């Protein structure tokens, strides 16, 4: 059985089929065009450069294309890269199903739906419960398929739902420790805070930003969705405004993308839960590709740090 891309070590030779996740054009210092491609399989992704590309070659190597690539693994400024020696588009009789090359959440979709449904069932505030159920039902198919981001954390198929399920479990544990928290508000905030990403992002594979995503962003999108849902359900109550605020403020600061800082206790806690789960996902995945006694590659979204895996951790 062939190794997955995340299992290769620096210096090893690679000769595998991979999926182009993204392809970005650049101009080298010598004035010649090149492509930066992110190649992936179910274990993760890796960056590679294609130098001196012609317009014809550029048209070949686009997102969602399966390629056969040979080369070697190198460490460039703390980041693992694939140095390409040979590359070609795969033939139809070699590989056919793109889904075989994408990373997926480690939990089944039906299990995640069941858990989220149980959290909604536990809500006692009818306005919060109705709004949350309505919006989840409206976007459920995309919610269960989409990643939580294009990069950095939970950027895999069903990553959005997996992120929410993990956050709900965190919210429950924190609410049990601090009973003054409004569980209904916190659970609803967790479920709704990133739901706008089903409109912001293009889909589960080779994910990019939509026009709405670029011009509005998932926070503004979801604030509007909550308002529309309240109108449709004829809910005219303060819960609507508080839920909108929780979504609006969940990034914490204006420089991080939130027009308002958290001004409600549950909004503050949601911000920390979101941040904690995202960072844990980044660290766990980086450390999962690292041997005991060694450092991870640099994690850009965590201040470009390399994390050490203790030698006694298997």
Curated annotation (Swiss-Prot):
This is 3'-5' exoribonuclease YhaM. It comes from the Bacteria. Residues 163-279 form the HD domain. One of its GO terms (biological process) is rRNA 3'-end processing. It comes from Bacillus cereus (strain 03BB102). Keywords: Exonuclease, Hydrolase, Nuclease. Pfam families: HD (PF01966), tRNA_anti-codon (PF01336). CDD domains: HDc (cd00077), YhaM_OBF_like (cd04492). NCBIfam families: PRK13480.1. Its EC number is 3.1.-.-.
């Amino acid at each position: 059985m062939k190794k997955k891309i995340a299992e290769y070590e620096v210096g090893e030779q690679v000769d595998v089929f991979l999926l182009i996740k993204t392809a970005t054009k650049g101009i080298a210092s010598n004035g010649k065009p090149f492509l930066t491609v992110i190649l992936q399989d179910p274990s993760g992704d890796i960056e590679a450069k294609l130098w001196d590309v012609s317009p014809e070659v550029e048209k070949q190597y686009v997102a969602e294309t399966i390629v056969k690539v040979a080369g070697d693994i190198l460490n460039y400024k703390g980041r693992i890269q694939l140095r390409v020696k040979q590359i070609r588009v795969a033939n139809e009789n070699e590989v056919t199903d793109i889904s075989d090359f994408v990373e997926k959440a480690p939990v089944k979709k039906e299990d995640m739906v069941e858990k989220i449904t149980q959290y909604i069932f536990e809500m006692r505030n009818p306005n919060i419960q109705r709004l949350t159920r309505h919006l989840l039902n409206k976007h459920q198919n995309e919610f269960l398929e989409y990643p939580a981001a294009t990069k950095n954390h939970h950027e895999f198929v069903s990553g959005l739902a997996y992120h929410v399920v993990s956050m709900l479990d965190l919210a429950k544990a924190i609410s049990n420790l601090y009973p003054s928290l409004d569980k209904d508000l916190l659970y609803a905030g967790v479920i709704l805070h990133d739901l706008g990403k089903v409109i912001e992002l293009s889909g589960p594979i080779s994910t990019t930003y939509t026009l709405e995503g670029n011009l509005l962003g998932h926070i503004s999108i979801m604030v509007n969705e909550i308002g529309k849902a309240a109108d449709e359900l004829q809910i005219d109550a303060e819960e609507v405004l508080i839920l909108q605020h929780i979504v609006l403020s969940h990034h914490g600061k204006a420089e991080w993308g939130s027009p308002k800082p958290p001004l409600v206790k549950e909004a503050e806690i949601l911000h920390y839960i979101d941040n904690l789960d995202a960072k844990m996902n980044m660290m766990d995945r980086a450390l999962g590709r690292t041997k005991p006694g060694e450092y991870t590659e640099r994690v850009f979204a965590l201040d470009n740090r390399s994390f050490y895996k203790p030698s006694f951790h298997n």
